[in-house]
Design a protein with these regions (language model features):
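Eukaryotic scaffold repeat domains enriched in small/polar residues
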Residues: 1-200
Length: 200
């Protein structure tokens, strides 16, 4: 598919792509914009704008789609906030502000009415988890998972990868693996379980 190019949709570096209801959603890492195209490659519209106002973002780093309720979550890594939009109307609905508390998140996953973010530390403290579960309405942290010593060779410092640590996002069991991890985990409705282990 050849994508249309104009002043509103210059794609320079693709960070994340999703297909939903006949449209292609592309997050461009350079312009920090989410562009939507149809399956012929025709540009349709953008979701979200750069700024400090309601529904605006500073550093858009990821997005996730709630396919049941037709919502899209745009993750702003600069503020640890998700702006939520209605996919059909493109209207801004609300924002979910999480509690940063010395950490930074770059990637999100929406799965089974739950929102997950990766978790890296801006300072040294006692928190060593790599993944957190966030309430989709309040932004409160519900649970944490995966000790960095066991699942990422002890590494838990801010480092934004070229691609998300979430894979197979639109399946019944999405996968998670961190940059130095040797275990690929399946995210189930009630727990995380190892799916594959790489021996090295």
């Amino acid at each position: 598919i050849v994508l249309e190019t104009n002043d509103k949709c210059i794609i320079q570096n693709i960070q994340h792509v999703e297909l939903f209801e006949g449209n292609i959603y592309i997050l461009d890492d350079k312009s920090r914009t989410l562009c939507v195209f149809n399956m012929n490659g025709t540009f349709l519209y953008r979701i979200g704008d750069i700024g400090n106002g309601k529904g605006e973002h500073i550093e858009l780093s990821d997005f996730a789609i709630d396919r049941k309720d037709k919502k899209i979550y745009l993750w702003d890594e600069a503020t640890d906030k998700a702006n939520v939009f209605d996919i059909d109307t493109k209207d801004y609905i609300y924002s979910i502000k999480t509690e940063r508390e010395g950490s930074r998140s770059y990637y999100i996953l929406y799965h089974n009415n739950k929102l997950y973010t990766n978790h890296t530390l801006l300072n040294n403290d006692d928190e060593t988890h790599l993944l957190r579960e966030i309430d989709c309405e309040t932004g409160k942290q519900i649970a944490t998972y995966l000790n960095c010593e066991e699942y990422n060779k002890g590494w838990n410092f801010p480092l934004r990868m070229a691609n998300s640590c979430f894979y197979s996002q639109n399946t019944t069991s999405p996968k998670y693996v961190d940059i130095f991890g040797d275990t690929i985990l399946s995210i189930l409705p009630d727990r995380l379980i190892p799916a594959y282990v790489v021996e090295s």
